[in-house]
Each structure stands twice: as C-alpha cells, then as structure tokens.
Amino acid sequence: VLTAKEIRIQQPRLLELQLRGAVAVHSQGILREDLLRIELSGVGQVVLDLEVVELLADLRGLGRMEFKGKADNIRLEINGPGLVEARQLKVRRAQIFIDGLGLCRLDVSDSLLADISGGGSIRYRKEPPTMLIRINGLGSIAAWDTDENGGPTRSEMAKGDFWSGRSVKEPKIPAFELGF
C-alpha cells in the first residue's frame, strides 16, 4: 500500500535522476547503464545498486548518496556537508570534487583525482597506483583504517563522519522506490 508520500516507479532504463528537497530514492535490484547522471539538492538520500560504465553524481546540501556494485568511471561533486558512501562500489577510475565539509568514502583501484576546497574528506580502501590531489583548506585524503573484514574500524567511523554521533535527528523524508 502506497501513501501519498510514497511512489513506486518501474522503468526499463534510467539515465538521469534529478532530486530536490527532502526525498529518498532506493533501488530494488541492480541498475545497469552505460551512463548514469544523478543530481541531489537538499536533505535527500539516494541508495543504488549499480553496474555502470560511467557515473556522474552531483550532491548539494546535507544529502547522502550510497552506492554499491561496479563502475568503471565516476565523477562526484559534493558541495556542502553531504556524504557519498561508496565503499561497496568497485570503481576503476574516480574524480572527486568537494567544496565544503563533504565526505566521500570509496573503493578505487586504478586512479584517483581529488580536489578538495574547505574541510572536506576523502577516504579510500587502498591507495591506487595513480593519484592526483589538490587540497585548498583543511581537507584531508587518506586510506581508511580497516578491520579484519575490510570495513572501517570504530575509530575510523568517528573521524569526520557527521552522520554518526550527531545530536540532531535526521529528518523524516518521503520514500521513492525504483524497481529495475
């Protein structure tokens, strides 16, 4: 049963997703595309299971994007205090641009281009062979500390992660489910 705030969309192909305001999007199943563009502005949440050649994601505001699966190339832009959680997304080449206090965690294997202005942070599983880094401000980039399963340790989760341990509650937002 769907309420007025829930919509279920079944679409054979999804090439672009533009979201504004307080909204949540969760995929049911794996989204397979050559190119996928995602733009989230506001206090939203996007959780997608992907197999893509190229992912272009733009996060503006206090949003959260969570990706898992595979991507050959990703280009992420975070403006503000947003979070991109991509530890479970196997990426070959990544370009990450952060302006503000954003945080990105990813698993990149071949190359990483990182550009941070402000206090943003990038955490990667293992240092790729090719890295090009520019930091203007108090930003940081480093490998995350891992436990025996390859996940972050408790101390790593506390470093720069504004989603854990905050005193304010996350807002209730309407949910959209996408079936592929």
Predicted regions mapped to residue ranges:
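Intrinsically disordered, low-complexity terminal regions
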Residues: 1-180
